[in-house]
Amino acid sequence: MPTFNQLVRKGRTAPKFKTASPALQSCPQKRGVCTRVYTQTPKKPNSALRKVARVRLTNGIEVTTYIPGIGHNLQEHSIVLIRGGRVKDLPGVRYHVVRGTLDSVGVANRKQGRSKYGAKRPKA
C-alpha cells in the first residue's frame, strides 16, 4: 500500500486497454489488396483447409485475413474490405474479409444469415 506522499508524487496509473485488431487503427473497416490467397490448417483438435488471404492495407500494414463462407473469387491483386474478428483455430488470423463488397462476391445459394455473407435475397 503506497503512502499518501507516494501517491502525490506518482499517482495511480489507469490500466492500458490493448485492442484486438490494431491494424484497423480504430476504424470499423479498412480496404486492402490481396498479396497472397491460400489455405491454412487449423489448430490441434480441428481439421480443415481454411481459406485465408494475406492483405496489404491502405495504411501499409500487411495482415492475414479469413475468407468466410463456401467458395470465393479472390486472387492476388483483388481489392477487399476487411473487418475485425479473429478465427479461434487459426493462430495469427485476427481479421475477416467482408463478403459482397468491392472485388469479393457474396456467397451463392445462401438462404439464412445472408447479410453476413453478402448474399442477395433469393427470388420467391
UniProtKB/Swiss-Prot annotation:
Gene Ontology biological process: translation
Any one GO molecular-function label of the UniProt entry: structural constituent of ribosome
Domain of life assignment: Bacteria
Keywords on record: Methylation, Ribonucleoprotein, Ribosomal protein, RNA-binding, rRNA-binding, tRNA-binding
A GO-annotated cellular component: small ribosomal subunit
Keyword RNA-binding recorded: yes
Residues modified to 3-methylthioaspartic acid: D89
Pfam families documented for this protein: Ribosom_S12_S23 (PF00164)
InterPro entries (alphabetical): NA-bd_OB-fold (IPR012340), Ribosomal_uS12 (IPR006032), Ribosomal_uS12_bac (IPR005679)
HAMAP family from the UniProt entry: Ribosomal_uS12_B (MF_00403_B)
Subunit (UniProt): Part of the 30S ribosomal subunit. Contacts proteins S8 and S17. May interact with IF1 in the 30S initiation complex.
Reported function: With S4 and S5 plays an important role in translational accuracy.
Record-stated family: Belongs to the universal ribosomal protein uS12 family.
Name this polypeptide is given: Small ribosomal subunit protein uS12
Species in which this protein is naturally found: Koribacter versatilis (strain Ellin345)
